Amino acid sequence: MFHLTTALDAASGVPLYEQLYESLAAEMRSGAIPAGTRMPGKRRLAAELSVSVNTVDAAYQILATEGYMEPRERSGFYVQEYLALPTRPEEVPPPVSAAPPEAAEPPVRFDLSTRGVDPGLFPFRTWARLQKELLYSSPQLLTHGDAQGDMELRQALADYLEEYRGVRCTAEQVVVGAGMEYLLSLLAPLLPGKTAVENPGYQRAKQVLENNGVACCCLPVDADGLSVEALSGSGAAVCYVTPSHQFPTGVTMPAGRRTELLHWASRCPGQRYIIEDDYDSEFRFDTRPMPSLQGMAGADGPVVYLSTCSRSLAPGIRIAYMVLPRQLLPAWRAKYRIYSGTVSRFEQQTLARFIREGYFTRHLARERVAYKARRDALAASLRAAFAPDELTLTGLHTGLHLLARLKNAPPDAALRAAAKAQGVALSLLSDYDLTGGERDFSGTFVLGYGSLSEASFPEAGETLRKVCTAAREASVTV
């Protein structure tokens, strides 16, 4: 008689063959049915367990398929030799002490972070209509796409960039990807040597480059942008810059400094490159935006142009793009032609139509009006809440944030703590110091105005005043 340690239960809802398989497999793993054991014949075991032969056959087939047993011709099924496992006492892990409960953070009342955008400005109806039309008319979009991105979108981007940013390129030079971080990760192995980054600057870009094995050096930013003098003495072969709207200072690099930067790169053709992150160039409120560095350099110049739809449309769209110099295209294709595209083809084709049919430029025009009104409201609220000589505002002409420098400011740590206590999400200029304190960036708020409504700014300004007062009081008592 063959005995199972676990009885089969016809009323359990689990098929009998699965129950039999699980029971036999467990006994084989534990060694209760030793390796080398000849298993009972199907009819005999079926009779002993009062089940059908089909039930036993199904369980045996699964056990054989998974290697628990092997069938031998005219001899039956045998338990595999390697299945018997040594038994050992179960190790009971030491108890883990409960973590102390964290104090609840005050809710955010005013989001003045630099990454904020207003989802209410997204063109929902137009975007949904275009996607619906594509869904029914273009089933081929469910298939694999080009690693560089769909040609229709690349052509639409090339045309748009030439007209509005002065970028000189063909669709062949455009690469579409799911975010700036992804594109930087692809770009990093193609470029030579050390990369210079701006300080204060974009920590995420520096981190992505370093994650991909690129050594970075941090160079100072002055009133005209990245110091080319410092760059020339740095030994860097690549520089990463945000010339249209330096992040986070808001400086726009003038034509003279741009020319100096291009001369630096052109002195060593093929050995020096500029990564131009065209951050916030769409949002220049009071004057026309300057043409891109890439446009000044030309299609064969040493500039890689980067941009994204995260600000102009929405972060969740996850569409970014770069324009490669023609001389880098062979290396890019050799390395990445086997990759799959990272952006939904439906999203790509929707954006292509959105651009081609004129919706994108009209959408940007509406956004500029809305964000300019918010910039004005934030600036007015700050001027009303603070004395004229107490706060200096800069970086107002472009982008979705401004800088507010305090006179006789309390320590930044006190300002951060007071802002958190008041429910204000914001940044300080020192948060973007990439060198760990080599320069003094203290006492300056970096205030985004993309998330809040105009009506919220008067109270937000008064709350910032309270933040400064509380921070001063806290720093005096320490």
Where do the protein language model's features map onto the residues?
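Active-site PLP attachment segment
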Residues: R74, M296-A331
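Residue-level detector of anion-binding/catalytic polar loops
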Residues: A215, Y273, V424-A425
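Conserved core of the PLP fold type I
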Residues: Q131, Q140-G270, E282, D286-A299, ...
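Residue-level marker for buried hydrophobic side chains located in beta-strands
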Residues: L112, I274-I275
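N-terminal basic, amphipathic alpha-helical segments
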Residues: M1-K132, P139-L142, Q327-L328, R333, ...
